[in-house]
A protein has these predicted regions:
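Short conserved micro-motifs on helix faces and helix-strand junctions that flank
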Residues: 27, 86-88, 177, 250, ...
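Conserved amphipathic alpha-helical interaction elements at protein-protein interfaces in regulatory
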Residues: 44, 48, 73, 77, ...
């Protein structure tokens, strides 16, 4: 953990001085049963800091249930609630990005999920560390109450990523973190289509501190990250911050070449010195051919993954489109259900 920095220089408070603003970016996907209890826990936790202005910015990631209706109901009762509704399901990382883009005017931004696995009270400790001078405070899991499969795969992923990544990405850390506005502004410059935000934040730098916490169980519902999405997310982390798979292909090629030289020398020596013991070896030859063909296809797949990421990136498509925005005490709900697709994309997209 980095050494504690000097306290953050906050403006001298006068009756006309605005209070520091802390914005929560809260991605939501099929969390209709969790929205109300989460918001109640969050407002209770933040009520102890009435010296700060709070904004609760929920980002609906194309939920299929009643999540959007529940969020708009929260907004009717709490003007601090903002709602962004993505035009389609773009994934957790893009939803967080949309929230960060919208919350860039805050002094600090806290990203957390809405399933109550990340306790809202921990975010208040993050604010304290931010006031002490940290630019990024990431919540590091001391323990987690997940299934054995989830714990095992997460443990393996973070260790593999730690060995392969070109930047120092903390282990056992998700997206639950606080970022100073300077960090948020820098993260906004990273527009990768295949996003791995915890790697991006690590790459940005600044003063980063860990905050240990115990992760709870989900309050209700099931995880929005099935096995397929977990594997894709892991691939984004490895391919986005490491060229080690490409280097492994080169090393494997040299190793197989060396092995083929040894095998050729062995076959030649047997043929010359003990011809009566030589065997045609068609079975061995067939197995070897299939093995090499399989390895070549795997290598092409790895190269293709990098090429595919490059192709997706150079297309320059917007990361997301907004179908609805509701923010601030005086902002109304802006929905675009009848707008033609081309105009809708221009009006609601951030590239």
């Amino acid at each position: 953990m980095p050494a504690r920095t000097s306290p953050r220089a906050l403006p001298v408070r006068t009756p006309d001085t605005p209070r520091p603003k802390i914005a929560y970016v809260l991605p939501v996907y099929d969390e209709a049963d969790n929205v109300a209890p989460f918001h109640a826990a969050l407002t209770e936790a933040t009520a102890v800091r009435d010296d700060l202005d709070w904004e609760f910015l929920y980002v609906n990631d194309g939920s299929r249930d009643e999540s959007l209706a529940r969020l708009l109901e929260l907004r009717r009762h709490d003007p601090r609630v903002g709602v962004l509704d993505l035009a389609r399901n773009c994934g957790h990382q893009i939803a967080v990005t949309a929230g960060l883009d919208a919350a860039g005017d805050a002094d600090a931004v806290i990203v957390m999920d809405t399933d109550l696995q990340d306790p809202p009270r921990v975010s208040l400790e993050m604010v304290g560390l931010w006031e002490d001078g940290a630019d990024v405070v990431y919540a590091q899991r001391r323990s987690r109450r997940d299934t054995l499969f989830k714990r095992t795969t997460a443990w393996a992923f973070y260790r593999v990523l730690d060995r392969l990544a070109s930047v120092d990405i903390p282990r056992d850390v998700g997206d639950f973190r606080l970022m100073d506005r300077r960090v948020v502004a820098e993260v906004a410059r990273y527009r990768e289509q295949d996003r791995f935000l915890r790697g991006i934040v690590a790459h940005v730098g600044f003063r980063q501190e860990a905050l240990l916490f115990d992760r709870d169980e989900r309050h209700a519902g099931t995880s929005g990250y099935p096995l397929g999405r977990m594997l894709a997310f892991a691939a984004n982390g490895i391919l986005g911050f490491s060229t080690a798979p490409l280097r492994m292909i080169t090393r494997l090629g040299f190793a197989l070449s060396a092995l083929s030289v040894v095998m050729a020398a062995y076959v030649a020596s047997v043929r010359l010195l003990r011809p009566e013991d030589s065997v045609p070896g068609w079975a061995f030859l067939g197995v070897g051919m299939f093995l090499l063909a399989g390895l070549q296809l795997v290598m092409m797949g790895v190269i293709g993954s990098y090429v595919g990421r490059t192709y997706t990136q150079v297309q320059g498509r917007p990361l997301y489109s907004l179908a609805l925005t509701a923010r601030g005490e005086h902002s109304g709900v802006r929905s675009l259900p009848q707008t033609p697709p081309d105009l809708r994309t221009q009006h609601g997209s951030v590239s």
